[in-house]
Amino acid sequence: MEKLAFGGGCHWCTEGVFQALRGVEKVDQGFVQSDAPADTWAEGVIVTFDPSVIQLATLSEVHLRTHSATRARSPRSKYRSAIYIFEDRQRHEAELAIAGFAHESGDAVHTVVLPFRS
């Protein structure tokens, strides 16, 4: 099992999106934080998933398509748009998903990849 966390809107709404996906074992909702300037608490969900069933790229794409990823927000916002990684090796795949979504949508995407701290 692997973990990722996602933020971008109300954690109650985000929780249901990920719970419906095959390969997602558990979704915990609450507040997450990263390093400065994103070190304030923001609403988010922690997703535990089986990478042999659902890939990190798929989870990232679902996240980008189900909240306002193209809306600029403060990094200190309660609704910070982010993909929080638990391992450094997850960064590249998450960044590729964001770049692909930006290319497809033709819009600037304001979702950032951040290390999960708590």
Model-predicted segments: where are they?
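Flexible coil/turn and secondary-structure edge motifs
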Residues: M1-S118
